[in-house]
């Protein structure tokens, strides 16, 4: 998802994918386990220590922005891409699982995710249509590779091999995911999410 958004917005697709792969790795560390407020910050340090590009390391930290009401959005384009991808994934998965906010109950902070998503797109000047992003995210969330027919997996592997691409689980995953688009997402879910994000933005900018 991050790679696709990066490519569409003019950022580095490979770095977008790499940042997404590493974005939650620091949650497994003892440091973040003891001090949760350091998530992202420690991820940046760990990524830098591993020799990752500075843009990738910074994106892992800054993708959490805005962290609170009134906070700035992520400063770099790559971090904005990752911030958008993570919030899209959270919203699509949350609504897809029926975990919609109700009244004052929002245990998965989907309202905050929606506002952060909208603000990052607008204030970051990312020229990618919101509805298209939501459709793509919902389509990806609907994919369960365990349910993909074996012959389709074999076809994907054969196609990769024919193009000289190393055949591994990640490559097959990307090949299968690339065939899913808006047509695979529930239109009602897309409409609901679209309205949800716009509602949060109206309230924020009205204030």
Question: Where do the model's predicted regions map?
Answer:
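Amphipathic alpha-helical "coupling" segments that flank catalytic cores
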Residues: 1-207
């Amino acid at each position: 998802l991050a790679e696709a958004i990066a490519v569409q917005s003019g950022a580095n697709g490979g770095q977008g994918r790499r940042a997404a792969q590493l974005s939650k790795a620091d949650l497994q560390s003892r440091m973040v386990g003891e001090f949760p407020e350091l998530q992202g910050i420690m991820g940046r340090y760990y990524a830098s220590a591993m020799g990752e590009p500075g843009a990738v390391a910074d994106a892992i930290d800054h993708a959490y922005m805005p962290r609170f009401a009134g906070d700035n959005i992520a400063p770099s384009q790559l971090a904005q891409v990752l911030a958008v991808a993570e919030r899209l994934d959270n919203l699509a998965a949350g609504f897809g699982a029926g975990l919609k906010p109700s009244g004052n109950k929002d245990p998965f902070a989907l309202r905050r995710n929606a506002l952060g998503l909208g603000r990052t797109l607008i204030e970051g000047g990312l020229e990618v249509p919101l509805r298209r992003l939501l459709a793509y995210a919902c389509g990806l969330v609907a994919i369960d590779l365990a349910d993909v027919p074996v012959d389709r997996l074999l076809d994907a592997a054969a196609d990769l091999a024919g193009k000289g691409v190393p055949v591994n689980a990640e490559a097959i995953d990307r090949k299968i995911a690339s065939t899913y688009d808006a047509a695979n997402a529930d239109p009602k879910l897309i409409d609901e999410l679209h309205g949800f994000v716009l509602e949060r933005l109206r309230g924020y900018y009205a204030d």
